UniProtKB/Swiss-Prot annotation:
This is N5-carboxyaminoimidazole ribonucleotide synthase. It comes from the Bacteria. Disulfide bonds: none annotated. Its EC number is 6.3.4.18. It comes from Mycobacterium tuberculosis (strain ATCC 25618 / H37Rv). The keyword Membrane does not apply. Keywords: ATP-binding, Ligase, Nucleotide-binding, Purine biosynthesis. Homodimer. GO terms for molecular function: 5-(carboxyamino)imidazole ribonucleotide synthase activity; ATP binding; metal ion binding; phosphoribosylaminoimidazole carboxylase activity. Was identified as a high-confidence drug target.
Length: 429
């Protein structure tokens, strides 16, 4: 009997990509979009301008303000979840979105601990978590009482909105602290005052948590600050005792669980000179201290954030190499005449292993316009190369006087450990 071909068309299974809405169009949203592409997801972003970093790369854009409820509703419409590139959305607007049925991650109840430093300090202190000694200030004269009590240098901080050293005054004396507090209060900005910690260094413990309650922790890193801005991240933190690293990871996972965080949580820490850990700040989103994970970890913070807010199983957060160093590229006081593209060309000629991530932002003094990752095993060498590369991209000038026209292996920056010639070998040639 002859077989007869079926005339029926095989069923086609359509794929509907999960839609994640993100408030904010900066570099964090831009890099989250890059992670979403690999996962087959659709990221919609709320931006203030079509020139914002994320708007340059994603086609799904809503232009509007994060303080406009109508704009927030537009970006959230039909999304599986709404998450954040920054913490500046007014909490009362997020509560209205939740009432509309929007899945907001992290929730407004969790996010307030990253928005309001005083609320965060009070919650953590009540839970027995070590924080610097602090006080909320309603009258500048209250600073005198606090300063007398702690008998230490003091710092005045805006309760909301400060970042990268903004909204923070490392007071010279009590009078300076009073003046800054008076300025803030006159502008309607609430302030707190805290002791200036005698610290060894600053650390960051980065974790992620899903609605299911699964947690994942990356290695604890050291952050290097200059003028209030992070310039370097070393992963893992050099010479950090295992017990202290484990304690920092456990603390971050505990805070994520107790605060109900969904997504990435960065816990900024002070390591004191006597080996204690104090919580400085919280961020409930991908964080500058986690940019190393793009190249240096099995799962980047951006992919992990997407996994977490969509309640996927979380990825492996282990490092892929012994050491990764990340250097921020900051806008120079005087932008160089050489184009960014030409600077990039010269950088790759000298350092072909540099992992460059540029944000599509106009160069302005001190502005974060990109970052560079270097992977390897020698901390000192990686830090040196990262700082050289970042300064070159910022200023168009090599701080070590390197000559791109010198014909040697050094022209491509191959260190001896990677097969390049040592200085002694060069002298023998």
């Amino acid at each position: 009997m002859m077989a007869v071909a079926s005339s029926r068309t095989p069923a086609v299974t359509s794929f509907i990509a999960p839609l994640v809405a993100m408030v904010g169009g900066g570099q964090l949203a831009r890099m989250t979009h890059q992670a979403a592409i690999a996962l087959g997801q659709n990221l919609r972003v709320l931006v203030t301008s079509a020139d914002d970093p994320a708007a340059q790369v994603t086609p799904n854009v809503v232009i509007g303000s994060h303080t406009d409820l109508a704009a927030l509703r537009r970006v959230a419409a039909g999304a599986d979840v709404l998450t954040f590139d920054h913490e500046h959305v007014p909490n009362e607007l997020l509560e209205k979105l939740v009432a509309d049925g929007v899945n907001v991650a992290p929730s407004p109840q969790a996010l307030v601990h990253a928005q309001d430093k005083l609320v965060m300090r009070q919650r953590l202190a009540a839970a027995g978590v070590a924080v610097p000694r602090y006080a909320g200030i309603k009258d500048p004269d209250e600073i005198d009482v606090f300063a007398a009590r702690v008998d230490a240098p003091i710092v005045v901080k805006a309760v909301r909105g400060g970042y990268d050293g903004r909204g923070v005054r490392m007071a010279r004396d009590v009078a300076d602290a009073r003046d800054f507090a008076r300025e803030c209060l006159a502008d309607g900005v609430a302030v707190l005052v805290e002791e200036r910690v005698d610290l060894r260094r600053e650390l960051s413990a980065l974790v992620a948590r899903s609605p299911f309650g699964q947690g994942a922790a990356w290695p604890v890193v050291q952050t290097v600050q200059r003028d209030g801005t992070c310039v370097l991240v070393i992963a893992p933190a050099p010479a950090l005792p295992d017990d202290l690293a484990t304690a920092a990871q456990r603390l971050a996972l505990q805070l994520a669980d107790e605060l109900g965080v969904v997504g990435v949580l960065a816990v900024e820490l002070f390591e004191t000179t006597d080996g204690a850990l104090l919580v400085n700040e919280l961020a409930m989103r991908p964080h500058n201290s986690g940019h190393w994970t793009i190249d240096g970890a099995r799962t980047s913070q951006f992919e992990q954030h997407l996994r977490a807010v969509l309640d996927y199983p979380l990825g492996d957060s282990d490092a892929v190499v012994p050491v990764t160093v990340m250097a921020n590229v900051l806008g120079a006081a005087q932008p160089p005449a050489m184009s960014v593209d030409e600077r990039l060309h010269h950088l790759f000629a000298r350092m072909p292993d540099a992992r460059v991530h540029l944000y599509g932002k106009a160069e302005r003094p001190g502005r974060k316009v990109g970052h560079i990752n270097f992977l390897g095993s020698d901390v000192a060498q990686l830090c040196e190369r990262a700082e050289l590369a970042a300064h070159w991209l910022s200023h168009g000038r090599w701080t070590d006087g390197w000559d791109p026209h010198r014909a040697s292996d050094d022209a491509v920056g191959v260190p001896p450990a990677c097969g390049g010639r040592s200085d002694e070998e060069e002298r023998r040639l």
